[in-house]
Amino acid sequence: MASNGTSVSPFRSQKNAAMAVNDTPANGHAEPSTITAASKTNTTKITSQNDPQSSFAVKVGLAQMLKGGVIMDVVNAEQARIAEEAGACAVMALERVPADIRKDGGVARMSDPQMIKDIMNAVTIPVMAKSRIGHFVECQILQAIGVDYIDESEVLTPADPVNHIDKSVYNVPFVCGCKNLGEALRRISEGAAMIRTKGEAGTGDVVEAVRHMQTVNAEIAKASSASDADLRMMARELQCDYNLLKQTAQLKRLPVVNFAAGGIATPADAALMMQMGCDGVFVGSGIFKSGDAAKRAKAIVQATTHYNDPKVLAEVSSGLGEAMVGINCDKLPETQKLATRGW
């Protein structure tokens, strides 16, 4: 149970110990075109210091520790404690949930570091924070204050219209969004240790997350049955690394964890994405924009754990109060769709 004082996070202690042994040099460049140990197990053997491949494997292993869990958006320490008590595996610290970012408009930037540190001090579970696409200085700041994961997020206003961040030069594991397999593999090639669907954050409409997961699954299935020549052609079409695509085809899944995000608002939504093959879920506006946040948070955690048990799903879906009103994605103008950001 977290207290009002500074909390000691067992996860953070373990992460810092692992990264201290396997420190990536400030100007080092990992080349994660082939991933081995971390795609098979939650623990990674560290083979040598300053080895980019080994460092990347450690980050992938840290991301795998969240598998099967729910990551919740929180805007203050009180919400973070509610999320932790509900069973969240991590929290995403940000000043405004995506629904408010949509409503308020303007430029959405990295959150105030002090607010993030307050949340880190309030809970013992991992804390994530968002940076703008391409804004490597925001990532330097987030790493400096000790966040556990960084989300290079399309929810914030992109800082670079062309380039994503070279994530390999940071010790902190990165999570990035995707709409399709090409985007996912490009982000992994840049050093992302965790992938999520983009969906349409802040809408409460799960349809885009479903679409993105279906697309990734279909493209992996196509790659898995392709000849070597066809696989090389597919890599060119997807604009991704051939070796990484080949590994994905052999695994019949992404070589890093793949969570669902964007529009998940109910326990049924969470179970739907898990049954489609996701490794866990992000829930943003769906919890703290609902009638009973604490009860809904617990219900979504239970639904994510027991996603194949309709009786449990029926039980945890009952009596939750009003869900967030939401926005129908079909009514969103293209200019308001966050998933189109990035490439």
Swiss-Prot record:
SUPFAM superfamilies, per database record: Ribulose-phoshate binding barrel
Source species: Cercospora nicotianae (Barn spot disease fungus)
InterPro entries, per database record: Aldolase_TIM, PdxS/SNZ, PdxS/SNZ_N, RibuloseP-bd_barrel
CDD domains: pdxS
Protein name per Swiss-Prot or TrEMBL: Pyridoxal 5'-phosphate synthase subunit PDX1
GO-annotated molecular function: pyridoxal 5'-phosphate synthase (glutamine hydrolysing) activity
Keywords: Lyase, Pyridoxal phosphate, Schiff base
Gene inactivation effect: Defects cause some indirect sensitivity to photosensitizers, due to the inability to synthesize pyridoxal 5'-phosphate. Indeed, pyridoxal 5'-phosphate quenches singlet oxygen at a rate comparable to that of vitamins C and E.
Role this protein plays: Catalyzes the formation of pyridoxal 5'-phosphate from ribose 5-phosphate (RBP), glyceraldehyde 3-phosphate (G3P) and ammonia. The ammonia is provided by PDX2. Can also use ribulose 5-phosphate and dihydroxyacetone phosphate as substrates, resulting from enzyme-catalyzed isomerization of RBP and G3P, respectively. Also plays an indirect role in resistance to singlet oxygen-generating photosensitizers.
Pathway(s) annotated for this protein in UniProt: Cofactor biosynthesis; pyridoxal 5'-phosphate biosynthesis
